[in-house]
């Protein structure tokens, strides 16, 4: 078992983002990297993710990034020997109104620019692709993206970590960071319960705990945990893991097959968030199932797939993805503290967006990032001209308007 040590680069967080950052930095030739995780790998927010990977986006920059990330997932085993269990089952997005049809048309236009294969389905084609959707009379349009799919979060994280270790990264579990030492305007060390370790760079990639870790370095950031839930049913006739991923934005629901069961969740319009000042580096961040919310998702999906009605629930999942007030990633170095770097504010894209965010982070450290990557800098929140109350309300609103699609993208 590895132990913390002095290192040039210290990544804090052993979920999808931290693991991806470790791998991509090492792949770019950076050496002397350690990753510190306070518990076990993929035991917190990443483990609760549904794993959807969608490439169809309304903006060219975001679509190209998700396409590049998906190619990483698709070819990772070939390139490294470790599988991410990416399932390319395709995805269907339904529109129930003319407004939503226009959104799908915008996505299709962007896909044409980026070369992503998509097509609008007739009702007959929709029934062929998704036979368990027995009631589609209210569907005005259906957009098919055949190269989308889903991941298993544990496989994703373990693959990143295994490949990173092969490239020389030290990965340490059960090593909670308790202090970040800043002197002369620069990072000097990190401390765990085992001791103090010199480091030139600390990369905070700890999901909903990222604000608490930044606070250890004297920095306040609006990284807001927002509760997200989904459930998996007992076996339901007709459902299987080869069915496409399904999104119905106007009823705020997503679903896919999980073996012979149904995985169903969504983005309710009255979310639950936590003031980041109330989260410490040791906070547990647990939640009980909200059966009103989960029942609402089930009822909405059953309107289209009546076989779901009455299905028993086998498991529920509650996670706290971190949201930013403007709905954009918080990625890159902090100008005010040399050596402090953020990889946070994933806005529910932590697993699916892990490769893209890590590529952005590597670019942000290159010395010549693109204007888009510069726009993701944590410097937009430093110095603090915002209030925690406003930040929490705005970040929660990003969650609540995830479906239908918000006007900004991470």
Region locations from a protein language model:
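Glycine-rich FAD pyrophosphate-binding loop
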Residues: 26-46
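Dinucleotide-binding Rossmann-like beta1-alpha1 core, especially the glycine-rich loop
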Residues: 50-129, 252-255
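Helical element adjacent to the flavin cofactor pocket in flavoenzyme catalytic cores
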Residues: 144-200
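Beta1/beta-strand and adjacent pyrophosphate-binding region of the FAD-binding site
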Residues: 3-17, 34
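Short beta-strand to alpha-helix junction loop
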Residues: 64-67, 94-103, 143-162, 286-293, ...
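Active-site lid/adjacent beta-loop-alpha segment flanking the redox-cofactor pocket in flavoenzymes
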Residues: 235-340
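Central helical "cap/lid" subdomain
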Residues: 196-244
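C-terminal catalytic lobe of FAD-dependent flavoproteins
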Residues: 295-394
């Amino acid at each position: 078992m590895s132990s913390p040590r002095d290192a040039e680069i210290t990544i804090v967080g052993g979920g999808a983002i931290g693991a991806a950052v470790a791998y991509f930095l090492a792949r770019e030739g950076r050496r002397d990297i350690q990753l510190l995780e306070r518990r076990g790998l993929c035991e917190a927010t990443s483990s609760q993710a549904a794993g959807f990977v969608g490439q169809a986006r309304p903006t060219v920059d975001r679509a190209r990034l998700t396409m590049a990330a998906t190619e990483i997932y698709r070819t990772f085993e070939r390139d490294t020997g470790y599988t991410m269990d990416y399932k390319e089952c395709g995805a269907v997005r339904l529109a129930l109104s003319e407004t939503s049809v226009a959104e799908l048309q915008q996505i299709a236009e962007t896909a044409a620019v980026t070369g992503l294969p998509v097509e609008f389905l007739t009702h007959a084609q929709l029934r062929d692709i998704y036979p368990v959707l027995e009631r589609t009379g209210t569907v005005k349009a259906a957009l098919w993206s055949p190269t989308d799919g889903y991941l298993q979060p544990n496989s994703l994280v373990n693959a990143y970590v295994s490949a990173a270790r092969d490239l020389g990264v030290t990965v340490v579990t059960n090593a909670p960071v308790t202090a970040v030492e800043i002197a002369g305007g620069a990072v000097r060390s990190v401390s765990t319960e085992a001791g103090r370790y010199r480091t030139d760079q600390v990369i905070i990639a700890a999901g909903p705990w990222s604000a608490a870790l930044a606070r250890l370095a004297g920095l306040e950031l609006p990284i807001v945990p927002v509760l997200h839930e989904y459930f998996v049913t007992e076996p339901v006739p007709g459902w299987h893991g080869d069915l496409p991923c399904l999104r119905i934005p106007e009823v705020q629901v997503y679903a896919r097959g999980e073996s012979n069961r149904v995985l169903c969740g969504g983005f309710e319009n009255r979310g639950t968030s936590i003031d980041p000042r109330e989260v410490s580096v040791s906070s547990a961040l647990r939640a009980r199932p909200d059966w009103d919310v989960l029942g609402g998702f089930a009822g909405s999906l059953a309107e289209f797939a009546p076989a779901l009605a009455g299905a028993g629930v086998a498991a529920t999942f509650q996670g706290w993805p971190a949201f930013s007030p403007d709905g954009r990633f918080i990625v890159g170095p902090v100008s005010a503290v040399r050596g402090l770097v953020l990889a946070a504010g994933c806005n529910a894209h932590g697993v699916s967006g892990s490769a893209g965010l890590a590529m952005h982070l590597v670019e942000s450290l290159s010395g010549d990032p693109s204007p888009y990557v510069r726009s993701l800098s944590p410097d937009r929140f430093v110095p603090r001209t915002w209030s925690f109350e406003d930040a929490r309300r705005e970040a929660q609103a990003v969650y609540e308007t995830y479906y239908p699609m918000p006007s900004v993208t991470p």
